[in-house]
Amino acid sequence: GFKGAFKNVMFGIAKSAGKSALNALACKIDKSC
């Protein structure tokens, strides 16, 4: 239902936010950007 869809959206947002945060961190560490 609606709750499940909302949970999936929130999970997707959290996942992509975490990914970009990790990428930014890796970029700072090894200066690859």
Curated annotation (Swiss-Prot):
Keywords attached to this entry: Amphibian defense peptide, Antibiotic, Antimicrobial, Disulfide bond, Secreted
UniProt note on tissues of expression: Expressed by the skin glands.
Record-annotated disulphide pairs: 27-33
Gene Ontology CC terms, in alphabetical order: extracellular region
Main location: secreted
Biological process terms in GO annotation: defense response to bacterium
Highest rank taxon of the organism: Eukaryota
A Pfam short name: Antimicrobial_2
Subcellular location: Secreted
Protein purpose: Has antibacterial activity against the Gram-positive bacterium S.aureus ATCC 25923 (MIC=9 uM) and the Gram-negative bacterium E.coli ATCC 25726 (MIC=9 uM).
Family statement drawn from the similarity comment of this UniProt entry: Belongs to the frog skin active peptide (FSAP) family. Brevinin subfamily.
Name used for this protein in its record: Brevinin-2PTb
Native organism taxonomy: Eukaryota, Metazoa, Chordata, Craniata, Vertebrata
